[in-house]
Structure formats: structure tokens, C-alpha cells
């Protein structure tokens, strides 16, 4: 496997302080991780206070609450990762070992490389979108200030976020600390989201690999042979199902919180673009909206992918077995395998299953809330 294998996830975990080379996913830089969390918390709560100062201003209210929700989600994701880091590290290393063992066979290696290439497309898309949010929050205020300087000869300072800093940001000795603090808060939320969400993508694709390798085993082996082949297949199928179950258990809380808030985030961000006007926050909101859409889609795509690949085992078993030549006893055993495979592996978020229908529900619900906000505005 090439150098790009697990590269996005490894770098993302290292940025937020974890050491992905250890089976326990130990926190290598706790002070840096603490600074990121502190910047998030100190950045989020003033936004809530500022948003609630004038409830009649829906634009200010929705702008600030959309960012507050993302910051809260990133903080929650980090806390979950800290609580479950040993389980996450164990799952990562189990998949590494399974992939290394399977890569000795050329066609198995081809499957592993293809799935990890798909993961890189997903992970890099979200990573680049998240870095776009950071860049927009850092560059847009500067460009707007420079544009004002060109037109009027006066540099008008604007901050990455609109809220009450309790300091006069028009003064240079206050403006630059506020500016850096604001960008760091956005970067912290983005880095923590990248670490968690790209890791979910990698785990999803590499769990899917285990189901795809089972299909290759069905194609390569004579399933009408001895009981050892049936036993080996059932054992590998059990491992794949256990990996999917562990993935669901680890990310259950994260998925639940994400999708309970996601439709509110979408409708609030969309509401901003239904209003006319330009500010330093518009590029930030636009890139933020793109990142949220990619984030939600990647989770639903991953859940649907695992579900469909686990279901495909039943069809593969049925198609590869020569049923007329098989003894009745062995036929019944393989029928039990099919029956188990017809109950798909799923990613649960306590109240819902993460799949493509969930994404449609989020979009429809966000549209309904957007219509409600437009009604309040009128």
C-alpha cells in the first residue's frame, strides 16, 4: 500500500494532538488539544450572548447559532474521541492488520487500494472544504478592509465573526488579538471536524473492504467442498459484522448529535443567502455551507455503503453455490448464512439509521424550517 494510505486521517489526528501510531490512540499533545478546546468554548458562548441581544434580528440570530452549533459539535466530537480513544485505536489497528494480511493476494490488494482511493476522494473533499472555511474567515475581513482603504483611505477593521468582544476592535491593539482569536476558533472547529469525519470515512470504507473480500473468497473457493471452508467463511463474515457493529457503537453519539442539529444548521445558513447584502462573513458562510453539505453527505453515504455491501453477501452466496449438487445438510447451513446476511450491518444514531433516506429527511426538514424563518421575517 502506498504512502497515501491513511495519510489524510493520520495528519488530521496529529494536528489535534493524537498519536495514530499507537493502538490506544494516545493524546500526544494534551496542552495543544486543550488550547483548541478553550478557543472553541471562549469563541462560542459570546456568539450566543450576542445573538440573543436582539431576537428581532433573524440574520444575526441564525448566523451566530449556525456557527455555535458547529463549534459545539466539534467540542462534543473531541470529548467522545477522548472517551473512546482506546476503542478507536483498536479498531484502526485491527483494520490495518486485516488489510496487511489480505494485501498478499494481488486481487485482494486491488480491492483494498480501490476502496482507499474512494476514501481519499471523500476525505480530501471535506478537508479542502473545511480549510476553505478557515481561509475565508482569515482572508475576507482583510480584503474588505483593504477595499475600504482603497476607496476611502481608511482601513476599516472587520472581524472573522460578528459578536460582542467586550473590547473596541477598532483600536489596533485590540483588533489583532481579536482577529487571531477568531481565526483560531474557526480553525479549531475545522481541525476537530476533519479529524473525526475523515476518520469515519476511512473506517467505513475499510469495513466495506472486509465484505468485498468475502465476495472474492466466494468466487475463488469451491463452496461445495469440506466443512472447513464453510467455517472459515462464517468466521470472516462474523469478523466483518463485528467491525461494522463496533464502528456504529463508537460513532453512535456523534451521529445522533450531528443529525439532531444538522437540519437547523442548514436552514440557518440557507436563510443567510436568502437575504440581500454583503459583508465579510458572506464568503465564510458560503464555504461553511459547502463543508456542512459534504459532511452530512459523507456520513449518509458511508452508512448506506456499509448497508448495501453487507446485503450483497447474501446475493453473492446464492449466486456462487451450486445448489443442486450440494447435500441437504450443507444446503441448510448455507441458507442460514444467507438469512444472516439479509440482516444488513447498519450505522445507528440511537433514533435513526444513517443512510441516504436520512439525508433526504434532513434536507426536507431544513427546507421546512427555512420556510418558517421566512414567515417570521415577513
Curated annotation (Swiss-Prot):
Give the highest taxon in the source lineage.
Eukaryota
How is it placed in the membrane, per its record? Multi-pass membrane protein
GO BP of this protein: detection of chemical stimulus involved in sensory perception of smell; signal transduction
Spell out the protein name for this chain: Odorant receptor 45a
Q: Cellular component terms, GO, for this chain's entry?
A: cation channel complex; dendrite membrane; plasma membrane
Give the similarity note.
Answer: Belongs to the insect chemoreceptor superfamily. Heteromeric odorant receptor channel (TC 1.A.69) family. Or1a subfamily.
Which species is the source of this protein?
Drosophila melanogaster (Fruit fly)
Role according to the record: Odorant receptor which mediates acceptance or avoidance behavior, depending on its substrates. The odorant receptor repertoire encodes a large collection of odor stimuli that vary widely in identity, intensity, and duration. May form a complex with Orco to form odorant-sensing units, providing sensitive and prolonged odorant signaling and calcium permeability. Involved in the behavioral responses to hexanol, pentyl acetate, benzyl acetate, and 2-heptanone.
